[in-house]
């Protein structure tokens, strides 16, 4: 049960930037975890420690975080001898060792790497599949397969096109299983490529950070129109619905929203007030089968969020607003800012805190969507996490790029392992029937 050794190293994420990988050894074997990284990061996220004083890797190295694992966290944990099955005790020990609320001393990327590896080791110690172990940690007796939200058109900070809104997603809510959902997602994705190629040419089929296409369009409505057409051609109208991640903090300027923010000469007269921006979203919801909108407003535009949430029945997801942080989530619940939490383990920096954030949101009647980051690795931990936490929904990119498929393929394996007992969230993705 005891940890024998911990070793961290610097590896690379899917954008070619350095990130932290941790190896943890017990008598059961070696357990490896890699930490993801975001592009559009909320200002309230736990601190991802980068080597800003070094010119190497454009000041994005993580050797300081690696050193903190190898020279501070590892010796302290080895001395403490906490069993790997005591996840909360291990995480709390590292949080106290850091001493800062945002994990700014050791780095959230250092602490999370160890936390992930400990979780994998704990599952092995109890001879449980990782998803079953996570369910045990969260107090769930059963598990559920999630609806995948495939990000098939990329804009915002994830792509070099003119689109302001960051992600246009498809959700196969009408599938009968996760396996069928993958088929639907793949077929819509390839039909979308054909639609984009026909209308904009082959170079418009370049993909963004998360595997989605990045056609050089500026009209966000056009992105939705392309999705609707691809869904229709694939034969899944009514079975595949649409989601969006607006990442509106990226185009928030001087209290207004600039949908031409990538243009240095953007005309201020065209910027939209929060109410005008809300009307754009309402028009989209009316015209297209949208079931989920993430980050429709700036992370601190607290007045705008509750108005939109109260005016629509769809899922309004807080990401930059809540950053998987219990204090931010508590405030959002109090003012009824949104009705769904986007759960990113690296925003808060430990498994225990991620589970606590999830349970807090679910207790308030919110949905929870587990998420990857745009800078990913081949680590597929979040696939087991979403099944174990029973959230019913996951977004981890398009059905393209191996670091994205690593998660989807693991979910296929889990569904196969569950066999006839596997349950797919489907139309109940916001509140899965466990």
Curated annotation (Swiss-Prot):
Coiled-coil spans are none
Q: Which PROSITE patterns match?
A: ENOLASE
Entry's cofactor comment:
Mg(2+) is required for catalysis and for stabilizing the dimer.
| Record keywords, A-Z | Cytoplasm, Glycolysis, Lyase, Magnesium, Metal-binding
Q: Which GO terms describe its biological process?
A: glycolytic process
Molecular function in Gene Ontology: magnesium ion binding; phosphopyruvate hydratase activity
Alphabetical GO CC annotations of the entry are: phosphopyruvate hydratase complex
Could you tell me which Gene3D superfamilies the record lists for this protein?
Answer: Enolase-like C-terminal domain, Enolase-like, N-terminal domain
| Pfam families recorded | Enolase_C, Enolase_N
Which positions does UniProt annotate for substrate binding? 158, 167, 294, 319, 371-374, 395
Annotated Mg(2+) binding lies at: 245, 294, 319
Keyword Magnesium (UniProt): yes
Classify the main location: cytoplasm
Q: Where in the cell is it found?
A: Cytoplasm
Q: What is annotated as the active site?
A: 210, 344
Q: Which PANTHER family match?
A: ENOLASE
Self-association or partners: how does it assemble? Homodimer.
Q: Tell me the NCBIfam families matching this sequence.
A: eno
Family label: Belongs to the enolase family.
Q: What is this protein called?
A: Enolase
Starting at the broadest rank, the lineage of the source organism is: Eukaryota, Metazoa, Spiralia, Lophotrochozoa, Platyhelminthes
Q: Give me the gene this protein comes from.
A: ENO
């Amino acid at each position: 049960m005891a940890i024998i050794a911990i070793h961290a190293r610097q590896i690379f994420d899917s954008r070619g930037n350095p990130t932290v990988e941790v190896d943890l050894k017990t008598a059961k074997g070696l357990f490896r975890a890699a930490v993801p990284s975001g592009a559009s990061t909320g200002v309230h996220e736990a601190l991802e420690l980068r080597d800003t004083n070094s010119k190497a890797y454009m000041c994005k190295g993580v050797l300081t975080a690696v050193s903190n694992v190898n020279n501070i966290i590892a010796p302290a944990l080895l001395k403490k001898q906490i069993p790997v099955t005591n996840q909360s005790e291990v995480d709390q020990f590292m949080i106290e060792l850091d001493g800062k609320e945002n994990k700014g001393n050791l780095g959230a990327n250092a602490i999370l790497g160890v936390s992930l590896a400990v979780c994998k080791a704990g599952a092995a110690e109890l001879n449980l599949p990782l998803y079953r172990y996570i369910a045990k940690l969260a107090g769930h007796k059963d598990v559920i397969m999630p609806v995948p939200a495939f990000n098939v058109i990329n804009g915002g900070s994830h792509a070099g096109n003119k689109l302001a809104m960051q992600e246009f997603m498809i959700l196969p809510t009408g599938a009968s299983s996760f396996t069928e959902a993958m088929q639907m997602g793949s077929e819509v994705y390839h039909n979308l490529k054909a639609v984009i190629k026909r209308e904009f040419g082959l170079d418009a089929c370049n993909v963004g950070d998360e595997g989605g296409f990045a056609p050089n369009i500026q009209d966000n409505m056009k992105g939705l129109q392309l999705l609707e057409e691809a869904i229709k051609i694939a034969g899944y109208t009514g079975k595949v619905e649409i989601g969006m991640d607006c990442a509106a903090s990226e185009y928030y300027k001087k209290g207004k929203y600039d949908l031409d923010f990538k243009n240095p000469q953007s005309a201020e007269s065209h910027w939209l007030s929060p109410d005008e921006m809300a009307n754009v979203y309402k028009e989209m919801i009316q015209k297209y089968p949208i079931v989920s909108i993430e980050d429709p407003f700036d992370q601190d535009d607290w007045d705008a969020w509750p108005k939109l949430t109260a005016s629509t029945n769809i899922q309004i997801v807080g990401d930059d607003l809540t950053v998987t942080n219990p204090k931010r989530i508590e405030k959002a619940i109090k003012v009824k800012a949104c009705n769904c939490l986007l759960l990113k383990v690296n925003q808060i920096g430990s498994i225990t805190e991620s589970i606590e954030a999830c349970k807090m949101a679910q207790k308030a009647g919110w949905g929870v969507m587990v998420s990857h980051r745009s800078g990913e690795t081949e680590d597929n931990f979040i696939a087991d996490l979403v099944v174990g936490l029973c959230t019913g929904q996951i977004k981890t990119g398009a059905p393209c790029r191996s670091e994205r498929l690593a998660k989807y393929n693991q979910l296929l394996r889990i569904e196969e392992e569950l066999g006839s007992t596997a349950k797919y969230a489907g139309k109940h993705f916001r509140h899965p029937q466990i």
